[in-house]
Regions:
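C-terminal cap/linker of serine protease catalytic domains
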Residues: 56-63, 106, 127-128, 149-153, ...
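Short, small/polar residue-rich loop motifs at catalytic or cofactor-binding pockets
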Residues: 68-70, 91, 185-189
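Short, solvent-exposed secondary-structure boundary/capping segments
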Residues: 37-49, 116-122, 173-181, 214
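Surface-exposed, beta-sheet-biased, low-hydrophobicity segments with strongly acidic/polar composition
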Residues: 1-55
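Conserved active-site neighborhood of the chymotrypsin/trypsin-like protease fold
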Residues: 78-155, 173-177, 234-247
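Short, acidic, Ser/Thr-enriched surface-loop or helix-capping motifs
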Residues: 77, 160, 195
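Catalytic nucleophile loop of clan PA
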Residues: 183-204
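Conserved hydrophobic positions within beta-strands
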Residues: 31, 73-75, 106-108, 165
């Protein structure tokens, strides 16, 4: 199912980690689910898709809290490679994946700050992984964003939103991104944007701040940018599906 294809990443950042000498700077990931990180975003005029909330570390008698935020990652290889946003794992000294209650160590394979992409690897071998579309999404093409908006505050179940591609460039005419009106909220960072064939057409990256009174200004990193990043790291991806799927099949 779609919920088997992604991960939750938790990153406790240096700025707020007050137990650093005792428990270290750790990121924890639970499968597709959301990712959690700390430091504020540096995106021009739009807010990085993340949330801030208080998180108390396990096995701590200290009443201090750690600030965290959330995002999403997804598998692209059966060797356990996971794609997410670079800002999700930024400033993280260790990353662990929790899959059906079992925790796995991970390794950061590559990080691209300019395109906000990262690849991490677990020692798991997932049965299903995402394929990447051969061409970038077209204007008005239907897309689905999957992930964990608001993290686990709502539920541990994967959530989806549906919309279309509304522009072929991102903020400031960034042609490595596209714009969509599919709902994107805090916790969607790094999540897959898929088409009706079930292929990846983008990676959720940012939403224009609603404080500016603007709705549906959400952005995804294009499939072509993702493919270049993946192949430049010596990885292959699955051939794209050619046939459109029903909504039921997409969910399964």
């Amino acid at each position: 199912s779609m919920s088997d294809l992604g991960v939750t990443i938790t990153n406790f950042g240096d700025e707020y980690f007050e137990w650093k000498t005792r428990s270290g700077n750790t990121a924890r990931i639970n499968f597709i689910k959301f990712t959690e990180k700390t430091s504020p975003g540096g995106y021009l005029q739009y807010d990085c898709v993340r949330e801030n909330f208080a998180l108390k570390p396990k096995n701590s008698n200290d009443n201090k809290i750690v600030a965290a935020s959330s995002g999403t990652g997804f598998f692209i290889s059966k060797q356990g490679h996971i794609v997410t946003n670079q800002h999700v794992i930024d400033n993280c000294s260790s990353v662990k994946v929790n899959f059906y209650g079992k925790e796995y160590d991970t390794q950061v394979i590559s990080s691209d700050k300019m395109n906000d992409l990262a690849i991490i690897k677990t020692n798991m071998n997932p049965e299903k992984v995402f394929s990447i579309e051969t061409e970038d999404a077209s204007l008005l093409e239907d897309v689905i964003i999957a992930g964990y908006p608001l993290g686990k505050k709502v539920s541990a179940s994967i959530k989806t939103s549906k919309g279309s591609v509304t522009a072929l460039a991102g903020y400031g005419d960034n042609f490595s991104e596209f714009q969509t009106d599919a709902a994107m909220n805090k916790g969607n960072s790094g999540g897959p944007i898929i088409n009706q064939k079930g292929n990846i057409v983008g990676v959720a990256v940012a939403a224009y701040g609603k404080k500016q009174g603007v709705e549906s200004f959400n952005f995804g990193i294009k499939a072509s940018t993702l493919k270049t990043f993946v192949t430049s790291n010596g990885l292959e991806f699955l051939p794209s599906n050619k046939k459109e799927l029903s909504n039921k099949d997409l969910g399964n």
